[in-house]
Every structure is written in C-alpha cells, then in structure tokens.
C-alpha cells in the first residue's frame, strides 16, 4: 500500500465485508459498494477472517489482486463465509454472531535467510513441489510462537513435514499485513 489505511477506511472495509457476507448468505448474490477513495481502489491482496465465539470460522484471501481493494474485500468475505473447505457455509442464523478481521497484504518477498523473518511483523508463505501453505503474521503472535515454530506450522498448513522448509527446493516468502478487525461482540 502507498500508505496505511486510516480509521474511516478500515471501518468502511469492515462494513463492506460484513454487508457482502449478509447479502451472500441471504441471496447468494455478489455485493459491490463502489468507493471513490484512492486507497480503497488500490490493487492489494487481502485475507478476510471470520470468527465465531472467538474461534476461526473461515479465512480466505489472495496475495495479489487485479480488483480494487474494496471489491477484493467483498469477494474474500463472501468466500470466507461460503467456500472455506474447513467449515460449513455460514447460515442465516449465524449472521448476528460473527466478527471480522481483514489483513491487507504487502507484496510477497522471497527470503533465503530465515533470520529475516520477524515474528509479529511477517507472515510466511511456503512452496515446495505442489504444496503451498500460508500463515498470516497475527497467527504466530496469537499462539506465542517463535520463528522455528512458525515455520514448522506453516509447513503443516501446506501438508508438508515440519522440516520441509529446510529443503533446497522449498521456497519461503514473507509479507507484512495491515490487520484490523471489529470489536468482539457477545
């Protein structure tokens, strides 16, 4: 991003994500709310995370996008609600009991030196053969992981052995994210 999102822009994206989920669950239709703000029209990757009762309920995103950020957020919100294969799709009765978190991503940067990975700042994306796995920066912080554990858990997410990141044919990428979310509701 050219600059950090301000509080109003963050609230706007959270509102777009929430409305996209509601429209998607209730009608199956896409939701688009055109925006004029320059930062909301930039092409950035993002992930939208849905939590219910403090537990992960869906998380889908892209590292890069051909769409303006506001459209990408709406699409990833609907995908998180309906297409995360780890969870059943949100239903109408779920619509008053979920919280959102949005991660707006920097471009991926390949790293050869794991000492460059800063827990709490970087997310990790690992590729090896046909396997891929990603963990967002906040995951390591939430679980109080060190760098080694973060790498091992990213390998597990990719379906790889925990030491796969050490292989010569494994590619490790880092990225940062501007992460913001809704207040937790009861």
What are these regions (language model features)?
Residues 1-186:
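Basic nucleic-acid-binding interfaces
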């Amino acid at each position: 991003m050219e600059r950090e999102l301000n509080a109003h822009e963050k609230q706007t994206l959270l509102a777009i994500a929430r409305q996209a989920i509601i429209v998607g669950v209730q009608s199956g239709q896409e939701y688009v709310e055109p925006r004029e703000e320059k930062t909301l029209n930039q092409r950035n990757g993002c992930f939208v995370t849905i939590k219910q009762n403090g537990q992960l309920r869906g998380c889908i995103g892209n590292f890069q996008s051909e769409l303006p950020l506001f459209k990408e957020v709406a699409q990833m919100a609907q995908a998180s609600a309906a297409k995360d294969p780890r969870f059943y799709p949100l239903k109408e009765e779920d619509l008053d009991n979920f919280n959102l978190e949005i991660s707006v991503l920097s471009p991926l940067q390949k790293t050869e030196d794991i000492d460059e990975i800063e827990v709490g700042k970087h997310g990790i994306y690992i590729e090896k053969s046909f396997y891929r796995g990603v963990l967002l920066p906040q995951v390591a912080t939430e679980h109080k992981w060190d760098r080694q554990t973060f790498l091992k858990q990213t390998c597990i997410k990719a379906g790889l052995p925990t030491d796969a990141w050490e292989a010569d044919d494994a590619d490790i990428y880092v990225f940062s994210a501007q992460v913001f979310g809704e207040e937790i509701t009861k």
